[in-house]
């Protein structure tokens, strides 16, 4: 596993929408995050299995193949990112997705149709702060 300083904020962004992925990557990078991106859940899992240990994971739920909740579940089962703040970012606001997210212990859930990158950043910071408290 990679060693990081206590002040480093590392985020893993996983979304199959490359435009949004790039927008969020720019926003978080400007806010001081070390950003890694993956345009598939398989790519995200490969990064984490390869030693990237994020302290925040921001994942889309609905993606081809394995969905974002399955990715979070796999990372947690393998204990690859202990203590990471996990936030689901999706166009879907279905009660089934929210229920699955809650059962997995996801820290936040953002419907992306109603948010812009600065709002997503603010919500991530809010959730990180409340989890540290």
Whereabouts are the PLM-identified features?
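Helix N-cap/capping motif at the beta->alpha junctions
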Residues: 37-46, 68
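Charged docking surfaces used in two-component/phosphorelay signaling
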Residues: 22-30
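Active-site beta3 strand of CheY-like receiver
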Residues: 52-58
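Short amphipathic alpha-helix used as the core "switch/output" element in two-component signaling
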Residues: 46, 69-82
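Receiver (REC) domain active-site loop signature in two-component systems and cognate sites
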Residues: 63
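Alpha4 helix (beta4-alpha4-beta5 surface) of REC/receiver domains from two-component response regulators
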Residues: 70, 93-110, 114-122
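Active-site residues of response regulator receiver
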Residues: 60, 90
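Non-catalytic signal-transmission and effector/linker regions of two-component phosphorelay proteins
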Residues: 1-10, 117-133
């Amino acid at each position: 596993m990679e060693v990081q300083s206590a002040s480093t904020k590392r985020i893993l962004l996983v979304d199959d929408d490359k435009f949004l992925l790039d927008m969020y990557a720019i926003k978080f990078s400007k806010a001081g995050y070390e950003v890694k991106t993956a345009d598939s859940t398989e790519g995200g899992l490969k990064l984490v299995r390869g030693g990237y240990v994020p302290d925040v994971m921001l994942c889309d739920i609905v993606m081809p193949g394995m969905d974002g909740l399955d990715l979070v579940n796999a990372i947690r089962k393998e204990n690859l990112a202990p203590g990471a703040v996990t936030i689901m970012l999706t166009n879907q606001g279905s009660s089934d997705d929210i229920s699955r997210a809650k059962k997995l212990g996801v820290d936040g859930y953002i419907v992306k149709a109603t948010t812009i990158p600065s709002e997503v950043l603010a919500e991530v910071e809010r959730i990180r702060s409340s989890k540290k408290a």
